[in-house]
Amino acid sequence: MIIFTDVISGDELLSDAYDVKLVDDVVYEADCAMVNVNNGDVDIGANPSAEEGGEDLEDGTETVNNVVYSFRLQQTSFDKKSFMTYMKGYMKRVKAHLAEKNPEAIEAFENGAKTYFKKVVSSFGDWDFYTGESMDPDGMVVLLNYREDGTTPYVAIWKHGVSEDKI
């Protein structure tokens, strides 16, 4: 299994247990699901009994995003201006990391990041934002949106801002 770990904060953000796809050679996207959680147990709602009336939630049960829940991501918020300011600083931190670890990837990162960043900004109101468990303000902000079907959530993380740790 591969765990995607933020190179700035050290937070675990995603794993290949989810269907991870590389987009524009700069962002990993993974579809998520909304699941029911009861006292730490996860119920994905599969195979409900024919006698049950539906998926009524039991007391103490809540519906959560499985990636957000599994990696203990913390929701945060931005207006467009503060997000752009954050991203400018974050991109500098990732570029400094790449200069030290993988200088030949800097150009691909800069070009791909600009393209994906424009996509996010153009649909800014559709995105939710999460930090890693440590809530490090310098760390990566995980992006969450919905596919074209309007019901399938997905997360996006910056490829060059994570290390891929095999466990």
UniProtKB/Swiss-Prot annotation:
One Pfam family assigned to this protein is TCTP
Report the subcellular localization. Answer: Cytoplasm, Cytoskeleton
Q: Which residues form the TCTP domain?
A: 1-167
Domain of life assignment: Eukaryota
* Entry keyword set: Cytoplasm, Cytoskeleton, Microtubule, Protein biosynthesis
Q: What's the main place this protein lives?
A: cytoplasm
UniProt xrefs under InterPro entries? Mss4-like_sf, Mss4/transl-control_tumour, TCTP, Translation_control_tumour_CS, Translational_control_tumour_p
Q: In which family does this protein belong, per the annotation?
A: Belongs to the TCTP family.
Q: What's this protein's name?
A: Translationally-controlled tumor protein homolog
The species is Debaryomyces hansenii (strain ATCC 36239 / CBS 767 / BCRC 21394 / JCM 1990 / NBRC 0083 / IGC 2968) (Yeast)
